[in-house]
Swiss-Prot record:
Coiled coil: none annotated. The keyword Protease applies. HAMAP family: Cytosol_peptidase_M17 (MF_00181). Presumably involved in the processing and regular turnover of intracellular proteins. Catalyzes the removal of unsubstituted N-terminal amino acids from various peptides. PROSITE patterns: CYTOSOL_AP (PS00631). It comes from the Bacteria. This is Probable cytosol aminopeptidase. It comes from Azotobacter vinelandii (strain DJ / ATCC BAA-1303). Its main location: cytoplasm. Mn(2+) 1 binds at residues 271, 348, 350. One of its GO terms (biological process) is proteolysis.
């Protein structure tokens, strides 16, 4: 889908469909009134017939509206007068696209810029609108014998006044890059585990580097991981025929001597649970256990498209967790790259084992800050559901920055405590720590475990178990989150 920004008068713009907002109570805003006046009152006449009340998300299609260059006019309900919430604005955008995609026109022009969204300026509301519209075009039918018909709608024109055109163009450009990154993340997450594995993710990273010469990729194989002493990482992979990979992405868009930000992604391409085998029901969704790594790749896709003046390193800790005669057993003790020993009480708590060695590896980059992203705990879904990612860390300023990025990107996170008292749940009589902390506060104790490997830099942990994918039903699939949050965080850090 192509996004175009124009400051043309909607009354004189030639388009297949002109989209106009109508408030609850059939109220027309300034733009809608001007269009209605040019059309000899055709819009207000249609509203008087009572076919559209103006509630959020309602639509009404008008054909052959006089004196307009548009072939048809789509009226979209915008709710009560005043500021809209992000959720309401997204509902309006989704309803707009839902109506447009069923029409015959190849383009449409939107006059939704005058709608007010709480806490958002022209840039903020335009980006939210553009991201919602673009993300709605996503489809994954790679393995369907019959492909979905190509969408007729090819171009969306965002109409604005000349004074705000630069901000609207900037927002549209950022939205396109973010949604492109989300699409890559969703594609990788939706791939079946027989085709998506550590070596294939390494190939994806290399392909991205071929497209953008500002990205360098290094892939550390099993031999190199052994040389580095990554005993925790290797323990996860030893039950699988798929070899592990630590994929290092290096983007240098800032000054050479500028410390980078490091994004660490959990990349368990299939998580059976290992010897601590998961229940069979829903196990197919454990292909999504690599969505942390996929979101880092997607964020890099957006970062590269935007060419941000910032240095960023990505670490994708990729392995497959399978049961076999060579698999790790409950009770095994392994030595991590940091030298700390871990008693593995549950082989299904494997994500933290690959991450802990990746976090130690991150020290060599002398980072400004490190954020790890992982589908780490089912407990996070219990605590926060699917609306917000869990957030913990060791630096208040970094936590605040991540929370703010989530709010600005409408991809929210919520902070959970990381009190010292929780650390005691990881005590082991045989090793420096256990890899689980019992049934209570599972999301927090998982973060406590990771915190022991992130003491030498500012660190934040995003648990995306509830936000990375949608379970079951027609909407089942990867969401692309938290690419918007992560990209916003980097946009904020690269702002002059």
């Amino acid at each position: 889908m192509q996004l175009v920004v124009k400051s043309t008068s909607p009354q004189t713009l030639k388009t297949a469909t002109l989209v106009v907002a109508v408030g609850e109570g059939r109220k027309l805003g300034a733009t809608a009134k001007a269009i209605d006046q040019a059309a000899d009152g055709a819009l207000s006449a249609a509203l008087k017939r009572g076919d559209l009340a103006g509630k959020v998300g309602q639509t009404l299609l008008l054909h052959a509206v006089p004196n307009l260059k548009a072939e048809r006019v789509l009226l979209v309900g915008a709710g009560k007068e005043g500021e809209l919430s992000d959720r309401q604005f997204r509902k309006i955008a989704a309803a707009t696209y839902g109506a447009l995609k069923g029409l015959g026109g190849s383009d449409a022009a939107l006059t939704l810029g005058e709608l007010q969204v709480k806490g958002r300026d022209t840039y903020g509301k335009t980006r939210l609108l553009a991201e919602t519209l673009l993300d709605a075009t996503y489809a994954f039918d790679r393995f369907k014998s019959e492909k979905a018909s190509a969408p007729v709608l090819k171009k969306l024109v965002l109409l604005c006044d000349k004074a705000g055109q630069a901000e609207v163009e900037r927002a549209a450009s950022h939205a396109q890059a973010i949604v492109d990154g989300m699409a890559l993340t969703r594609d990788l997450g939706n791939l079946p585990p027989n085709l998506c594995h550590p070596t294939s993710l390494a190939s994806e990273a290399k392909a991205l580097a071929k497209t953008y010469d500002t990205l360098k990729v290094e892939v550390l194989d099993e031999k190199k991981l052994k040389e580095l002493g990554m005993g925790a990482f290797l323990a996860v992979a030893q039950g699988s025929d798929q070899p592990p990979r630590l994929i290092v992405l290096d983007y240098q868009g800032g000054k050479k001597d500028e410390q980078p930000f490091v994004l660490v992604g959990k990349g368990i391409t299939f998580d059976s649970g290992g010897i601590s085998l998961k229940p069979g029901s829903g196990m197919d969704e454990m292909k999504y256990d690599m969505c942390g790594a996929a979101s880092v790749l997607g964020t890099f896709r957006a970062l590269l498209e935007l060419a941000l003046p910032i240095n960023v390193v990505g670490l994708l800790a990729c392995a497959e967790n399978m049961p076999s005669g060579g698999a790790t057993r409950p009770g095994d003790i392994v030595t991590s790259m940091s030298g700390q020993t871990v008693e593995i009480l549950n082989t299904d708590a494997e994500g933290r084992l690959v991450l802990c060695d990746a976090l130690t590896y991150a020290e060599r980059f002398k980072p400004q800050a490190v954020i790890d992203i992982a589908t780490l705990t089912g407990a996070c879904i219990t605590a926060l559901g699917t609306q917000a990612s869990g957030l913990m860390g060791n630096d208040d300023d970094l936590i605040r920055q991540v929370l703010e990025a989530g709010e600005h990107a409408a991809d929210r996170a919520w902070q959970l405590p990381l009190f010292e008292e929780y650390q005691e749940q990881l005590d082991s009589p045989f090793a420096d720590m256990a890899n689980i902390g019992g049934p209570k506060a599972g999301t927090i104790t998982a973060a406590c475990f990771l915190s022991r490997f992130a003491k030498n830099y500012h660190w934040a942990h995003l648990d995306i178990a509830g936000t990375a994918w949608i379970s079951g039903g027609k909407e089942k699939g990867a969401t692309g989150r938290p690419v918007p949050l992560l990209t916003q965080f980097l946009l904020d850090r690269s702002a002059p």
